[in-house]
């Protein structure tokens, strides 16, 4: 059984000197910080909403959740901020697995949606194809990046629009993000990646999902 790395605990409220949780991106910590910007500060990095230790697809999910939920839920999610520093799995199937889990959550609300069903099948096919595929190699990384910036992101955005329209959207989105972070950290630990390790080439800052 894979040993899980010790979790860095965030306080329930931001410590003195750290910005209060807020929606959207910020130019300066004095104006507040979204969940990803808080994660970057806690990791000791630059003030950015795309911290190096967080997988781009997970960061995109976190930005949408942060910007879509109410203030109370956003503050309740603050303890997750430190977890994002070690949430960048290297296995190539991870992106499609994450997007597929969001699509599945949306299908609970719209089980008859042919579009969501098609997106879910596409994610499953890609995940099955890439499971146990080595992470190395520029061609593979380029193909993964193209999928994420193309259909992967479109599938994620559509599923999140469905979830955001639910009457209990805050609860659904918060639960989804908590599970996604836990899964990403578990997979990162399984990769044997050193905490705060180097970001693989070609996987730098991603475009934003919702901005």
Task: Explain the meaning of each model-derived region.
Residues 2-78:
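N-terminal, leucine/charged-rich tether regions that mediate assembly and partner docking
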Residues 47-204, 208-211:
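Structured binding/interaction patches within domain cores
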